[in-house]
């Protein structure tokens, strides 16, 4: 302790009467460690709870003490990084750190003006420098090389301690350069961070000024998760913006807990040499290269209106931000709506300016816009796979080019589809687009990079689509892909060329109509759906033949949203988008009303005379069939794929009979079904009709025909209280062999031989019908492959109910639930004989539940009744 400090401490009463002078001297000479810093508020001399002890005798004479060793503080880490050399202050910390106000063990310093007796008793050489100063920064007024200050100790008395000049030092870590990064503060020998709560540009500007990195600072945030284990020192920093050091700002000492948003304070600094350019930032983007353009003017952030906003303006913004690559303008608050004022409007840059300030524009604050028109930019770095449209009138149209290995190249149009166009336009920021003629744009002279591109429509980037290897193609530049993209209109109205596809049809020319809107495939409701609407869909897909509309989920129910309802086409429109008069997503429909189309439709109803001779002698012939498709466990069949499938319908007073049972056509005039189908409504022929050539129960079709019943013959051994002899024959109305007209969709099945055992002679068995699908009764004809089982399975399961006049069929495993249920009673169990003829071996009769594990279905064995069938039908 120096003499001056000892005198001051004595005058202030810091040395109690009970402590001998020699002990104080010895403590000072041996540099006894100071007390721990007090935990409460600090006041000069004493804490408020203590009384100053009465002085009973004058202080003893003060000997001369050796001065503390001169120790220069270490250089600031940030100064070394930035290339600065700290200038020593003549009587304190270096010039860059004159604001330290705590001791090296963390005790807050007292204000110099609060210890006036020091001046009066033993003024040091530099005391005049501190006269009237109410600050508490560490100084060395007695000429010692190491700054110090007074502090209140744990007992409420005044003591002194050395200071660490690095306390409160600032550095930026983790940035791309020295002008940006996470703010770190040095305290108590450890670097720590600042919680980002209330962190703003005023705080950031003080940091930048303190680091001599310019007077402009932009507040940023960094996740704590990427900083490792590091303490937090401050929160709620509240700078005015003109402070010379962050230590001069109001702030809260971190007391623990959770920092809001778990973000640390960070800054980006910039100089203001040359012309005064406005501060710009990009907000709301997925990276630092894109976002809503915001300007800092008159002390607040604001946006730019997108009137006249184009790629030339974006070029200037990217240049001003130091971002290279492809500059693109974005409109209509693409990166979200901002807040605060709209700063600028009608910006009209040429693209060569250094700052938006140099571009023609409105006066600051003058505009006629809302935040729905906030402008944005993207400054996409030139990396492999970046795409652009070149040679057009703007960035929305032109020749498709891809950047690869430092060079732009084109894409060949082999196999190009609307889905490819959609992915390209979406990546470029547009909602829709269409392929344009390459003749509209100048031919490229660069390489052809890609060929045979195929997108599904779900890709977010063009390079996610399947394609050939880079540079492999068999094209010329006359086959370059050209595209015109369109933004989404107001209220989500569609522009031209949104993707359309047909699903679940028998071929690519038919199916359920689905459209791709707002990133999702969805369906169209069939309200008002006509052949004119179908014609537009088919034309959009490139088909020129006749088109037919299909309603009532003819091709099965879709999934996802129902995008469109009440389509009104005249038949001459270029695309479905021209027919849509109602807002997207607005409807009153279910997927049971999904619309469909058949393109290049050339179906024609067959003539009875023309088919009589060629088809009357043929049975079991499937003219229309395709790959196997698996009622319960089944899927839609092919139209006309099971031409002997008919339905027994119960007539009603309205004339539209409902499905009662399935049945099998044996000839033009005879149908085979189950006897139990007549158990409830009796055997009066007036109650029933038979429909042949049907596929969708609610949609009339060209091969469909409904015929009255002339005779019902139930096997004489059938009893309503039994399941045995469950077989019946139905005679259709009409002349002999001229009841039903044969066609590719209406043909008879073959009968088996008497006592034929299908397990040995047949394979590839199916059940068909409109029955239970596991969710509801189907509107479209279903089919399901089903294995024949040894009779012992049903004998064990059903005991005495199963007889030798029955067949056992079905899957025993729960995960392969295939069965023929209530709506398919009387329907056929068909198996294929070698030679491709199909034989009706079973009639759906009964079972336990529907698709229940270990409960196979039971079918009437037709081969046991062949003599009876022939005697009745005379076949």
Swiss-Prot record:
Cell compartments where the protein resides: Secreted
Physiological role: Plays a role in neuronal plasticity and the proteolytic action may subserve structural reorganizations associated with learning and memory operations.
Similarity section: Belongs to the peptidase S1 family.
Keyword Disulfide bond: yes
GO CC terms of this entry: axon; extracellular region; plasma membrane
Intrachain S-S bonds: 93-165, 109-149, 138-163, 195-259, 208-269, 239-249, 305-369, 318-379, 349-359, 412-475, 425-485, 455-465, 525-589, 538-599, 569-579, 619-750, 661-677, 765-831, 794-808, 821-850
Domain Kringle: 93-165
A Pfam short name: Kringle
Classification via Gene3D superfamilies: Plasminogen Kringle 4, SRCR-like domain, Trypsin-like serine proteases
Carbohydrate-modified residues: 26, 683
Site feature Reactive bond homolog, where: 630-631
E.C. code: 3.4.21.-
GO MF, one example: serine-type endopeptidase activity
Residues making up the signal peptide according to the UniProt record: 1-20
Domain SRCR: from-to ranges: 170-271, 280-381, 387-487, 500-601
Organism: Nomascus leucogenys (Northern white-cheeked gibbon)
UniProt xrefs under PANTHER family: DELETED IN MALIGNANT BRAIN TUMORS 1 PROTEIN-RELATED, SRCR DOMAIN-CONTAINING PROTEIN
Protein name per the record: Neurotrypsin
Region (Disordered): 31-88
Alphabetic keyword roster: Disulfide bond, Glycoprotein, Hydrolase, Kringle, Protease, Repeat, Secreted, Serine protease, Signal
Keyword Secreted (UniProt): yes
